[in-house]
Amino acid sequence: MRKLTCMRMSAKMTILFSVIAACMIAVNSVLATLSEIRNILLYEEDNLNAMASKIVAAFEQNITVMGYALDGLKQDNDFMAALNTIYTLGEDMETTSEYHQAQNTLSAALFHEPLNDYFYRINVLTMDGFYLSSRYETIGLLENYSDELRTVMHRLPYLNERNRGLSQKTLVRPHIDPWFVARRISIYTLMSPAVYHGKQIGFVEVNALSTDLFDIFSSNDMAGFRATAYDADGRLFHRSFDDTIDYSAAEYGSMTECSDKNGDTYYVVKEHCSWL
């Protein structure tokens, strides 16, 4: 069986789109001329590229809105000053009125962030063990300054990258929510260092449910449409179907044939796309 796939590349992410091509009925027909086959393939390629562009735009918009939430907090002078107070005072001063006032300022900003309702939770943290979330939980959250919370923080690779710029946003592929231990919830994260007067004092992150990706990377406009995304390191970011296709033969600017482990042949289009 031959199928159509669109592989769109960016500096950070590879997104693979595929759909079973109805035009293969014509390819297998002795009545179809070579000219007709070529026209059908071009038509299907155009349709798939249009659908891929629509999906990529929706994904980019989703990440951009997450970025707006991050920037809104990081550009809030009161919020950043309060986080700096928490960072400066630390665990030993946790019971002071100054600490409590700073924490209340952070809570008010998190709970009243206009974009809060769009996402699973928005968090702020410092690496010495402070954590605060926009999502109120009565049970299941790790306790501030506890050994358990500090252990989680220091085990998360995306919080410990040494080569990250102070203004850089990092998109983290789907993972189990590390802060909520009552049950396993899969999320994906956009995070950024929190910088106050040129000094990094913590992190701000936006978490969204991984199930949202199925809505973003799906389409009802094309029967059999499926999508898979990989990050810059080739690790799976999202998959809506089992994919064993070997894309090594794919080339820019032309539609090529690739096969999976079952011997099924796919038509592949490889393109660049902007991301964030």
Give the residues covered by each predicted segment.
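N-terminal sensory and localization modules of signal-transduction and trafficking proteins
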Residues: 1-7, 46-47, 214-215, 229-233
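Juxtamembrane extracytoplasmic/periplasmic/luminal helical "stalk" adjacent to the first N-terminal
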Residues: 7, 11-93
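Short hydrophobic alpha-helical segments used for membrane anchoring or interfacial signaling
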Residues: 75, 122-130, 226-237
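Amphipathic coiled-coil signal-relay and dimerization helices
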Residues: 81-83, 130-137, 234-240
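Well-ordered, non-membrane alpha-helical segments in soluble/globular domains
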Residues: 99-109, 150-157
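Solvent-exposed, extracytoplasmic
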Residues: 102-113, 195-238
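Extracytoplasmic/periplasmic ligand-binding sensor regions of membrane-associated signaling proteins
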Residues: 114-118, 124-207
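Extracellular/periplasmic juxtamembrane segments that couple receptor/chemosensory ectodomains to their
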Residues: 196, 221-224, 232-233, 241-276
